[in-house]
Curated annotation (Swiss-Prot):
Principal subcellular localization: membrane
TM segment ranges: 24-44, 50-70, 79-99
Keywords from the UniProt entry: Cell inner membrane, Cell membrane, Membrane, Transmembrane, Transmembrane helix
Full protein name: UPF0060 membrane protein ACIAD1364
Length: 101
């Protein structure tokens, strides 16, 4: 949910600036980014650990966006890179003093 809010918050300005879409898209962009920031504050763990674990989730979500929204076939490098970062995020999340207590 957090990654989707961030991606949407960045995608709407992309549509405005690169594809000439309506400036009304700034409104959902601002709302999406505000939701993104709010969601990051909900977890009691240290902020650096949250951002590190979230990075892996964000990359996975961005790759899914690339595949299903942008309709670009993932390369083996995309898949392997996504796997590596998800494993790294899992190590951070599942450590004894990690995000899941």
């Amino acid at each position: 949910m957090t990654a989707l809010a961030e991606i949407l918050g960045c995608y709407f300005p992309y549509l405005i600036l690169k594809e000439g879409k309506t400036h009304w898209l700034w409104l959902p962009a601002i709302i999406s980014l505000a939701v993104f920031v709010w969601l990051l504050t909900l977890h009691p763990a240290a902020s650096g650990r949250i951002y590190a674990a979230y990075g892996g989730i964000y990359i996975f979500t961005a790759l899914m966006w690339l595949r299903f929204i942008d309709q670009v076939t993932l390369t083996r490098w995309d898949i392997w890179g996504g796997t590596v970062v998800l494993l790294g995020a899992a190590l951070i999340i599942l450590q004894p003093q990690g995000l899941l207590k």
